[in-house]
């Protein structure tokens, strides 16, 4: 709809609920706080949006199963009206915000990703026509950006006013050939693990490299910030 009004000559601001609403949950995990009426929107969904051609976002198109027929029937922005898109806007609604910690969790690092989208020029990968080359370049650039957030930006946030209760996503984990492999959405944060089924705490072992497991080990993972605050844990199935 935004392109319709921009093409009619109106100055418009994009506020896309499927990418720019901070109160949308990113997956079906019941531990997440927020809403899902506009789908599941994670940090990468926000980062990959092409403001001037939303269907040029191949990551979002594929994730949301948007058909070729739908794309062809939808109004596109006339290049001559590009200047009518004067910005983008994020939203955070308070229906599910019951305390300050939930506000922090929805706000940060969402605002970091959104600010990068709002204040940066179009990335080069958006101009790549070859699908394989585009996807590999996109993944490379996204990996750089999320490493920057985890290793440089969030440690600064930890020291502002004693830190914010920003989102600490559950780590990812898999067990292959009796070996544990784990990662996090923002490399640089601390992944703690236990193998006895207990809840990882700040004194638990750090995950730094793949770990060989015993047959009866029960693995739990949990992400921690530099102030010792932990996120929700996850148990890794064998």
Name the predicted role of every residue range.
Residues 1-171:
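Flexible, acidic glycine-rich loops studded with aromatic residues
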Residues 131-238:
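Short, compositionally stereotyped local motifs that mark structural "simplifiers"
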